[in-house]
Amino acid sequence: DFTDAYANTKYIAGGDRYPALWAERAASWREKASGRFIILRKRAYGPHERNHYDLFLPEGTPRGLVIFVHGGYWMSLDPSFWSHLAEGAVSRGYAVAMPGYVLCPEVRISDISRQVAEAISHAAALVEGPIHLSGHSAGGNIVTRLMAAGSPLPETVQERVASVLSISGLHDLRPLLATQMNATLRLDAAEAAAQSPVLLAPRGRFMLATWAGGAERSEFLRQSALL
């Protein structure tokens, strides 16, 4: 039952409360950090109201650019829930960009990958140095997909990518074809294969790490082990 295998919230006590807690923590950090760092919110990279990213800049010249792509099964959330996750990198001198994107079912997963590539390119034009990609869940899929064959990420940007971190990422989308959420994702067999990094050759040379919680559900442990 793949619908159950990918249903996280119902297996976490009080799981429904977490998004509100994330948003509260993110807003609190932005308020506290505004005196230490430069915070540029909702920088547009495309025509849609969701085509924007938040950019957090350290004092002085950044050491490089860290990208964090949020999860939510391509169907929910936005960068405003995750601002506090920028603290570690920006405190160490890196710029951090968190892209937003149009959600399914308004677009398809392949469209989201293209949008995030555009957001990364936009931020990369503003910040010099190495690029470090990271993403959680669906975001983990996106960042690993962008570093595989057929990626929409421009070669000039791809060549700057030094590392990729996928946190509880989904690297083989074919099981999602058998889930109830696919009524919203609208994946077909061809797109599921084309957006599965595990089925594609890597693009360029970069350091790759996949992480999942030791107590996560078995399907997420399996997905992390695939790469």
Regions found by a protein language model. Name each.
Residues A5-G60:
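N-terminal cap/lid segment of alpha/beta-hydrolase-fold proteins
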Residues L77-A86, A97-H132:
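Catalytic nucleophile-loop/oxyanion-hole region of alpha/beta-hydrolase
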Residues E59, G72, G214-E216:
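Residue-level signal for short, function-critical loop segments
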Residues E118-N182, A192:
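Primarily recognizes the serine-hydrolase "nucleophile elbow" in alpha/beta-hydrolase
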Residues S163-L177, A189-A225:
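The feature captures the conserved acid-bearing segment of alpha/beta-hydrolase catalytic domains
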Residues R63-G72:
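Short beta-strand element of the alpha/beta-hydrolase
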Residues F56, F68-V69, S134, I167, ...:
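Short hydrophobic segments within beta-strands
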